[in-house]
A protein has these predicted regions:
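Glycine-rich, basic loop-to-helix element that forms the pyrophosphate-binding segment
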Residues: 127-144
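N-proximal low-complexity "stem/linker" segments adjacent to membrane-targeting elements
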Residues: 23-85
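Conserved donor NDP-sugar-binding/catalytic core segment of glycosyltransferases
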Residues: 161-192
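Short, acidic, metal-binding catalytic loop of nucleotide-sugar glycosyltransferases
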Residues: 85-94
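Catalytic donor-sugar/metal-binding loop of nucleotide-sugar-dependent glycosyltransferases
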Residues: 245-262
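A conserved acidic beta->alpha catalytic loop
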Residues: 101-110, 129, 153
Length: 278
């Protein structure tokens, strides 16, 4: 389709469906079909302001420190700001954010110093060199002081009730070694939420076919220490390889049936949806 025809098609889509309709069509063309019902009503799956307030005032019997670890590398400021604001907006407050930065410049360091130096929960380490996704994640894990480790990619965002729901699950199942949640996608350009991944409960057979667990993944720190670091030989599939090692050590793996993780899709992503290739 030539440029003129593309422009005419876009104008027609805007007239018929508006800018939102055009954005959805572009996303479908770039990635995969959209679940229009979810895209239209995604906020119904999120915590309300009233629920958030109740959660903020909830006292659990066990209120562990949760360390959310993030490997950074030339992370766009807009993505990092949204990630951090998502952490600051958590209804559960006993957390720390461990940022391990393998960037060749000090741009991120300066950004954090200018905007977030007052919050001691946000911890930053500038790495001497970029070791890749696995090594940088290992550095972030090494910073962690929490009882549980949550894995967050540098361009993604947690739902406001993510850590609350994790801690609620931990209180309901004190034996839990691994916890994971449902997730959706958020388009970097339009901000549209789409492609929810409503997962099955722990299913070892399905996990042999592909990494359906994916995000949001939380692991007890002692269990993570037992299975060992992320293996850089599996960069690109390091989460999957870690999960498989975890399943060799425990079956105390619990699923939170709520969307707690927003996976940002943009042109720099290698993969954009959970599938056998993830």
């Amino acid at each position: 389709m030539g440029l003129t025809k593309k422009a005419a098609y876009a104008v027609g889509m805007i007239r018929k469906h508006g800018l939102r309709g055009l954005a959805i069509k572009v996303m479908e063309t770039k990635y995969e079909p959209i679940d229009h019902e979810y895209t239209k009503n995604w906020q119904n799956y999120m915590v309300t302001k009233e629920e958030w307030k109740v959660q903020r005032n909830t006292l659990f019997e066990h209120m562990p420190l949760v360390s959310v670890v993030v490997p950074l590398y030339e992370t766009p400021e807009c993505f990092l700001r949204e990630l951090i604001e998502g952490m600051l907006g958590q209804s559960y407050e006993n957390w720390e954010l461990c940022l391990a930065d393998g960037s060749p410049t000090d741009k991120i360091e300066r950004f954090l110093a200018e905007n977030y130096k007052e919050d001691a929960r946000i911890r930053y380490r500038r790495l001497l060199e970029n070791g890749g996704i696995s090594e940088n994640t290992n550095e972030a894990v090494a910073m962690a002081m929490g009882e549980y480790i949550g894995l967050l990619d540098h361009d993604d965002v947690l739902a406001a009730n993510a850590l609350y729901e994790v801690v609620r699950m931990l209180n309901a199942h004190p034996d839990a070694q691994v916890i994971y949640s449902d997730e959706d996608k958020i388009d970097a350009e339009s901000g549209i939420h789409s492609r929810p991944h409503f997962k099955t409960d722990y299913n070892p057979e399905l996990l042999m076919h592909y990494n359906y667990i994916c995000h949001f993944l939380v692991v007890k720190k002692t269990m993570l220490e037992k299975v060992g670091d992320f293996n850089p030989c599996y960069d690109g599939a390091q989460d999957y390889e870690l999960v498989l090692r975890l399943t060799e050590q425990t079956d105390a793996i619990y699923h939170i049936r709520k969307i707690l993780y927003h996976w940002r899709i943009h042109s720099c992503l290698l993969y954009t949806s959970p599938s056998p290739r993830d």
